[in-house]
Amino acid sequence: MAEREHDRIPYSVQVEFRTASSFLVAYSVNLSRGGLFVETDADLPTGVLLSFDLQVPGVGFLHLVGVIAWRRGLDSPDGPPGIGIEFQDLAPQLGSAIDKLVSLFRGVQILVLSGDRQDRTTLARSLKSIISTAEILQAADADAAASLLTSDIDLAVVDLDFDPEGALETLRRAQRLSPKVPTVALTASAQLREYARTAGADELATNPPPFGELQVVLVRALSKPVSVRSTATA
């Protein structure tokens, strides 16, 4: 019966997370509450069943079944396009995997690039207050950031206003890594926001960022999968 029910699921989504830490952030914010938002521009209808395969470093593949509860379109002012997925009781499917990942969790590494010492210190304190286990690495210029920016970094937060060219190059460098490092770009300039998008910034925030806005973009960037693929199965 279970196999026949699985055969009737019309859509399948495969989601690959960059690190175990990325998945744990997504779980703590979304999955533990019974849902998940996945960025995708695929035109999937609401109300249908979805086969959902998660690829997580450290535990391999996890299989879930959910329902597409809502969609956000390309032109929405509320954020990137995607689908909101609702799941039923997740404990049987994820319990042992979460226990294993939590036992191995050693926090996240966040690189902060800002040419202003006071701004850099204030930003580092705000990040620590949002994620207390985070290790904050600080860089005063793009050269220092380049020496610290490796695939071991979980997130780079980049101030564009002090040295725009150096900051944009840092965003591009993060994109070139394999796997790429997610980035949050901070700027008070509308033009620099567009440049940051072109350079590959995953999230944008005003500079200096209000605490609530920083919290939203930080969690969203940390929990963002490296790839999302959707296919029709029927």
Region spans (language model):
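C-terminal output helix
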Residues: 209-222
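Conserved phosphotransfer cores of two-component systems
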Residues: 150-151, 173-180, 199
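Alpha4 helix (beta4-alpha4-beta5 surface) of REC/receiver domains from two-component response regulators
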Residues: 169, 188-205
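N-terminal helix initiation/capping motif
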Residues: 1-31, 96-138, 227-234
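Hydrophobic/aromatic residues positioned on beta-strands within the core alpha/beta folds
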Residues: 184-186
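Short strand-loop-strand
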Residues: 9-53, 82-84
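Short beta-strand-centered aromatic/proline hotspots
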Residues: 26, 63-73
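Conserved phosphotransfer microenvironments
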Residues: 142-143, 155-178, 189
